[in-house]
Regions:
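Long hydrophobic alpha-helical segments that form multi-pass transmembrane helix bundles
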Residues: 71-150, 154
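Small-polar-interrupted transmembrane alpha-helices in polytopic inner-membrane proteins
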Residues: 18-35, 71-75, 182-193
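Membrane-interfacial entry segments at the cytosolic side of transmembrane helices
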Residues: 61-71, 176-183
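Membrane-water interface at loop-to-transmembrane-helix junctions
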Residues: 138-146, 172-185
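Specific transmembrane alpha-helix
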Residues: 1-3, 44-57, 147-170
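Hydrophobic alpha-helical membrane segments of integral membrane proteins
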Residues: 35-52, 63-71
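Membrane-interface interhelical connector segments
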Residues: 199-205
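Membrane helical hairpin/interfacial module
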Residues: 1-43
Length: 205
């Protein structure tokens, strides 16, 4: 997105208008793919978040982009810790624990109902049934957007900073930064992934 805006503006065109038109096209393609082929299509999400970037961060100073990126990227992690803390506290109160388990069970039932509906529509229904089910699934997926959208927005803002700051255009002059990012990424990400694979080798859906 940042590359498109920068190039359009540098060429004397209205980058915002071009950006909006292409986002609308991406939204249409993503919606068609989600309804006609697969409800988990990421293009629809990218288009919606692209409009958020356009409306909220188009005029953000370059120096603030990585700060916003970090804040949005870690927000879901903080929410996860908060939910884990709430679950721990709830477990100490029998009534609260029962309510928490009731809510989790209801959510599990909703997910199971979606999965059963998808199997029935795709496995035994008509193509129209499958499209209708994918519409339901797409709506449910968008309902979870609030949980993972901040992470994606954070990544987008990092990318915008790399472009608008000139770091990508003159990568040779910023090799120390790239090496530092590589070392931090491997130093934190690899141990976490190994720990995750060790503690949760499989997941049940």
């Amino acid at each position: 997105f940042a590359v498109m805006l920068e190039r359009a503006n540098a060429g004397g065109r209205n980058g915002t208008a071009l950006y909006a038109r292409r986002l609308l096209a991406l939204l249409g393609i993503g919606l068609a793919h989600a309804l006609l082929v697969w409800s988990g299509d990421i293009l629809l999400t990218y288009a919606l978040l692209g409009f958020v970037l356009l409306l909220c961060f188009r005029r953000t100073p370059v120096s603030r982009l990585p700060k916003w990126g970090v804040a949005l990227f870690v927000l879901p992690l903080l929410l996860t810790f908060a939910m884990a803390g709430f679950a721990t506290l709830a477990a100490q109160d029998p009534q609260a624990a029962a309510e928490f388990q009731k809510g989790m069970a209801a959510q599990a039932q909703q997910i199971a109902a979606l999965a059963d509906g998808e199997r029935l529509a795709v496995g035994a229904g008509s193509y129209a049934d499958a499209v209708a089910q994918r519409a339901t699934d797409t709506g449910a997926m968008l309902g979870f957007l609030v949980f993972f959208a901040p992470t994606l927005l954070g990544v987008f803002l990092f990318g915008a900073w790399f472009m608008r700051s000139g770091t990508i255009r003159d990568s040779a002059a910023h090799l120390p930064l790239f090496r530092r990012l590589r070392n931090i990424g491997f130093g934190i990400g690899l141990p976490l992934m190994l720990w995750s694979a060790w503690t949760h080798p499989t997941m049940s859906f």
